[in-house]
Amino acid sequence: KKFLNDKIYWCASSTHEGEELIAAKAYLILKKKIKNLILIVIPRNVQRVSEITHMFSELGLKTHRHSLNKKIPTDTNIYIVDTYGETKVFFKVCKVVFLGKSLTLNGGQNPLEPARYNCTIIHGPNVSNFHEIYNLLGKNKIAFKVTNQNQMIKKINELLTKNIPTKNIKNKIDKIGDEILNKTFVEIKKFIRQ
């Protein structure tokens, strides 16, 4: 956490093959505009970490793996979370999260966990498993769909450089939940009356 104190950072979480490369290339462009920028990558499958680390190295990026439990070098570009069960720790400190399985694969990942931690969510168009939730989050400006790397860069730059409040995201989520629950009760009552 101390390492992040003077940094600006965003997270690419639950990433699948191909998405880490997109995030890393976006990072390289954003780094030219935003000083002290760090990308936190949380791959869905930690068995791919060696492959991911090598790919980042090929791009000239310096990485640090969370499992090393060592002091983080000051020239680190990408912090790789290669352990299970700690995602929420990083959601608590990140303002912006790209959720994977949405740019290169179909289905998407559940956006409610990062939203509960006041994260603004960026996702690709392939979110069929959570379509309704993403629509609700999109209408409430909690989640933003991007279809390519350029859109990702533009949206992340906007979210990190503009003073967009995120503290009320959890309140918006609670309100959305209440609305869904009320609609569900209305539908159940209709069904019971039949």
Predicted regions and their residues:
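Nucleotide-activated sugar donor-binding and catalytic core shared by glycosyltransferases
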Residues: 1-194
